[in-house]
Amino acid sequence: MQKFFLVLSFFLIQTTIFSQSVDLEGKLKAQEEALKEKSKGEEKDTLSTDYYKIFYLDGRIDNVDTTLNIYKDYKFNFLREDSFDLISFANSAHTYNKLAYDFKDFSKPDIGARGKHFHYFEKEDIGYYNVPTPLTEIFAKSTYEQGQILDMLVSINLNPQYNFTIAHKGYKSLGKYINTRSRGNQFRFISNYESKNQLSSWKFHFVSQNIFNQENGGLDPDSIYFFEQASSYFVLDDFGNQIENEDGSFEMIEYDGYLDRSRLSPMLFAEGSLYSKRFFSDFKRVILKGKKDTFNTLALNYQFTHEYKKIQFNDPMNNKMFGEVLDFINDDQNVSDQNRFIEQENRLILSSNSNKLGKIQLSYSLTNWVNNFKIYENQDIGNSVFELNENQSNISFDWKKIFSKYTFELNFNKSSKDSFKSDFISLNIKGSPIKNLNFEIGSSIIEKSPNFNFKFYRSGFESYNWLNDNLHNEKISNINLKLSYKELLVLAADYN
């Protein structure tokens, strides 16, 4: 009996010890799992703004900037860029007086009316996004009087290869003066695709813009006098002479009503607008790619641009400040000029990127322009020209190479015909020999045709009708030097 009790006790003790060890191991494993889950929850998101990329047609790549600094304050305006060299008109979304002139303008001839294009989205201004998470950007600002500006952008990647962006800028401002109201809508749809093997990419955008401004031509002479003399005015007699008091002073009246700008009479009651739609497509295919070095590539691009613009000017009072109206415009009609412009371009680009030679790009483009004007009712056309249809082809060569701390750039373009040409050659050297101190020196020779409105224009005003067949091209030789310290100090000099 004692032996049986001892054996039974031995097995019971062993079973208890074994069960305790199993429970202890289970608790340890549970604690380890809990620690792992806790550590996962405490892991910080390592995603930074460097992953939010913006690509431009010229090859520039920017990161989305979410910092708050003094540079952002310089750009907190209607143009959303540093407007140091611009003097704005009396209301938002109007034109500007430009104090600095860029002599390195390599652009092709356009419709003209550059006063309407300060905040116009050109195809070079469109950025193509690639973001790991949905991105929203909102810019809002009040205007001078009874209005706001809202510019909103939403960018989403459906997958790592495809991104689409929708943006809209809307604004309205009454202004402080009579007949200076402005309003507009600028819609952008942007698409960016790149294949997984990075051999194919496609950039596309559609932009619709509607820019409207009332034009008052400035204040009339009486309004200028009353505004400058406020708030003390001389009292005149029936003959227009000043009334003299007994003490020898002239009688005056106090009235500050003309300090209210909304009561001052303007020179003009007219309206001007710019309406535009543009489709742009850029398809790229890498033909050759180095196995070891991704910089040794050879690629082919096809770019297509179709842009339509319509500029209108309406003067219901047929103001004489522009001269006499044409004979067929009677008292029941008003001047309502309309200019339509279509540009269509096809471009082929062969580009190479190698460590030894740098970036080389050779392109050929064919451009067609159609520029026509409105024909008024009862207008005798006769032999007058109301439409131009022009073609131009261009060959371009671009080279960029980085040597140590210095970057060399060479740009060349040659047009096939003299009319509406845009020939240029430019050499540029950039460098940063000292931290935060940058320099740029360059030279360029440009020969280009003026915009279409210098060569050809039709209007209801007699003095604004011309067709300049023998208009000379503009020739510019330029040497420029630029020194900058961060973005706080910029010194630039040009010799032409």
Residues covered by each model-derived region:
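An acidic- and aromatic-residue-enriched active-site/binding cleft used to recognize and process polar
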Residues: 143, 159, 167-173, 207-209, ...
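The feature marks either
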Residues: 39, 232-259, 278-282, 293-308, ...
